[in-house]
UniProtKB/Swiss-Prot annotation:
Tissues/organs with expression: Expressed by the venom gland.
Species of the source: Pseudocerastes persicus
Keyword tRNA-binding applies: no
Superkingdom, taxonomy of origin: Eukaryota
SS bonds (residue pairs): C14-C30
Transmembrane segments: none
Entry protein name: Natriuretic peptide PNP
Role, per record: Increases urine flow and decreases blood pressure when administered to rats by intravenous injection. Inhibits thrombin-induced platelet aggregation. Stimulates cGMP production via the natriuretic peptide receptor-A (NPR1).
Lineage: Eukaryota, Metazoa, Chordata, Craniata, Vertebrata
Keywords (A to Z) from UniProt: Disulfide bond, Hypotensive agent, Secreted, Toxin, Vasoactive, Vasodilator
Localization: Secreted
GO BP terms in the entry: regulation of blood pressure; vasodilation; venom-mediated activation of G protein-coupled signaling in another organism
InterPro entries named in the record: Natr_peptide, Natr_peptide_CS, Natriuretic_peptide_brain
Length: 37
């Protein structure tokens, strides 16, 4: 619905494509990426 909370985790376990490329070359991955960091 329209009142759904912001998605903190994408279906793939990533936080979106913005950090997707960052995690890919940083080696941080998606699951290890902590929200708010």
């Amino acid at each position: 619905g329209e009142n759904e909370p912001p998605k903190k985790k994408a279906p793939d376990g990533c936080f979106g494509h913005k950090i997707d490329r960052i995690g890919s070359h940083s080696g941080l991955g998606c699951n290890k990426f902590k929200p708010g960091h």
